[in-house]
Design a protein with these regions (language model features):
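Surface-exposed loop/turn motifs in large extracellular/passenger domains
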Residues: 1-169, 173-296, 300-333, 337-552, ...
């Protein structure tokens, strides 16, 4: 490698996976079909087949026993680019990188002994620097494979894992200081391998996979729009550098997926289609040897800007699997729009079962479904639709949510006209739907034939529907039909500090109970809870209440006040009809 082959850029994605400050990134065009300087490039292809692409400096022979080399490390921090096209001050369009059957990517380490990291491998459809990347694609076809190497995480100040940036990246269209549009990644029955070092019995790895990605080293805005990530066969596998098989070994892959992502600007109209993703691989002869992946999916994301009109479609052929990994928890997250300055008109569609039989129990277990996440700005017109599905992890659904950074609370300025519709769904832990903002109005949450089942032995965090505003919560509707929940804490509330008005909760054919042998729990149903609660309506038809042995356990009212001397409640209405079955004691 000659130094004059290396390019340097001011960028944000460089030192660790969570960093957003501007720093210098060094880039090496490692394997490029077409490279231009101050010119555009189109219709180029890079096809990899029947071979291994490796960055290894020393390859230990498999058929000869020799002494391992000294454990020296170059500690390089380079982005190794493998792409059909590389433009410097030019646009890249309609280019393809194709990974075919028996092609194997093993980039990012300098030896096969301790797997010391020596760079961040980028497998890309096309890359444009100081230009736009449009209509490019990365195809990872059946029978191909990509390796992910160990990357030890550190905890940031918010308690999140942050990895060394020298991890594997798969990108459809990449731009430095440019826009990305209509780029695609197709993953079809491909093998994704966690490669662990010798003398280890547990390992962590990380991966970034994005159909369109923009890195930026200035304050100028760039747009990631209409990019598509399509996954129909992400098959997790593992490889260990042990001379003989250990008694136990556990690898965990943290994988982040984006339809479109920008460091600075807007993420608009990006899509993820998630069809088949196998996240657990066990050894045939020893179930104590296994690899597992924990996922975050973001249809559209901006680290400094808005995320609007993005869509995440989940229709899994096989549900995600759960395992008792060495981390002690199972957690997956799905985001429609992830932003800092506004997230609107984002949609999450879910069909078919989400997870398999529950083996794990931890306070950290979660299936997070977040239509909109933003630190400020509006979170309006976001939607979550779930139909004919099941989860054995606790389910937390947010149309808009509070965020805590550096011990400070951040709320969207508004959460209006959001919608959650859940039909024919069972959660075998807890089910919670939350909307949190400074103002929340005209939101709708609808259940039809939904179960929230809590086993006695499970860690019970309660099942809830809560619309909560710091200022006003008006004209919201919670409509529940054919619903049952036996969580210890059932709460169905519309609440705001200053005003809760013209809200409506409708409950038809519903059962509330407690799974615990103690038969102790809390049930709260209040259509308007505020310092000023008025014109709220609670309608109940055919309600079944199981045994609650503890006192002060059931609160059902169209409105309630906070207890302040100036608080007021008026013009609220309660309707109760049909069969009201209450446990005799």
């Amino acid at each position: 490698m000659r130094e004059d082959e290396v390019l340097s850029f001011k960028a944000r994605h460089g030192v660790n996976t969570a960093g957003h400050s501007i720093k210098t990134v060094r880039v090496l065009p490692f394997l490029i079909t077409a490279k231009t300087d101050h010119a555009d490039a189109s219709y180029n292809k890079l096809i990899l087949e029947q071979g291994e692409l490796s960055s290894v400096f020393y390859l230990k022979p498999k058929d000869t026993h020799i002494k391992n080399p000294s454990n020296s490390k170059s500690n390089q921090r380079m982005n190794f680019l493998m792409s059909s096209t590389f433009t410097h001050y030019g646009n890249a369009s309609y280019n393809q990188t194709i990974l075919q059957k028996d092609a194997h990517i093993s980039m990012g380490v300098e030896n096969t002994y301790d797997l010391a990291l020596n760079g961040a491998p980028y497998l890309i459809g096309a890359i444009a620097t100081y230009g736009d990347s449009t209509n490019n694609s990365l195809n990872i076809e059946a029978g191909s494979s990509v390796e992910f190497f160990t990357s030890l995480p550190k905890k940031d100040k918010n308690g999140n894992n942050t990895f060394d940036e020298r991890i594997t990246h798969l990108v459809g269209g990449l731009a430095y200081q440019g826009n990305v549009k209509n780029n695609k990644i197709f993953i079809k029955d491909a093998n994704m391998i966690i490669h662990g070092p010798s003398k280890a019995y547990a390992s962590l790895a990380a991966a970034h996979i994005s159909a369109g990605y923009i890195d930026s080293g200035t304050d100028k805005n760039f747009q990631a729009s209409k990019n598509l990530l399509d996954i129909d066969g992400f098959n997790l596998d593992m490889y260990m550098n042990h001379d003989k098989q250990p008694l136990a070994y556990n690898s965990v892959l943290f994988a982040d997926f984006w339809g479109g992502k920008t460091e600075q600007g807007q993420a608009l109209d990006n899509t993820i289609n998630l069809k088949d993703i196998k996240n657990l691989k066990k050894d045939k002869n020893n179930e104590n040897i296994f690899a597992q992946a924990l996922f975050n999916f973001y249809a559209g994301a901006s680290n400094n800007g808005e995320a609007n009109y993005n869509t995440l479609n989940i229709e899994l052929k096989h549900p995600l699997e759960i395992a008792n990994n060495f981390l002690g928890y199972n957690q997956h997250s799905f985001y429609g729009g992830f932003a800092t300055k506004g997230a609107n008109h984002n949609t999450i569609n879910i069909k078919n079962d989400l997870t398999t039989t529950d083996l794990s129990q931890s306070y950290k277990d979660a299936l997070n479904i977040v239509a909109a996440r933003t630190l400020e700005g509006s979170a309006d017109y976001n939607k979550v639709y779930i139909n004919n599905s099941m989860s054995t992890l606790p389910v937390y659904i947010y149309t808009a949510k509070k965020n805590i950074l550096n011990n400070q609370d951040f709320y969207p300025s508004s959460a209006n006209n959001n919608e959650v519709v859940i039909k024919d769904f069972a959660s075998f832990r807890n089910l919670t739907v939350l909307t949190e903002a400074k103002e929340a109005s005209y939101n709708t949450i609808n259940y039809n034939n939904v179960q929230s089942i809590t086993d006695v032995s499970n860690i019970d965090k309660g099942s809830k529907i809560i619309i909560r505003a710091l200022d006003k919560a008006n004209h919201n509707t919670i409509d529940i039909k054919n619903y049952s929940s036996n969580a210890a804490d059932n709460a169905y509330l519309i609440m705001a500090y200053n005003e809760a008005a013209y809200n409506k909760i409708i409950i038809n054919d519903t059962l509330f109970g407690v799974a615990s042998d103690k038969r102790e729990g809390i049930l709260s149903i209040i259509a308007g809870l505020s310092n000023n609660a008025h014109d709220n309506t609670l309608i109940i038809n055919n309600l079944n209440l199981d045994e609650y042995k503890n006192n002060n356990s059931i609160f059902i009212a169209p409105s309630a006040i906070t207890g302040l001397s100036e608080a007021k409640s008026y013009n609220n209405t309660l309707y109760i009809g049909g069969n009201l079955n209450i446990f005799k004691n």
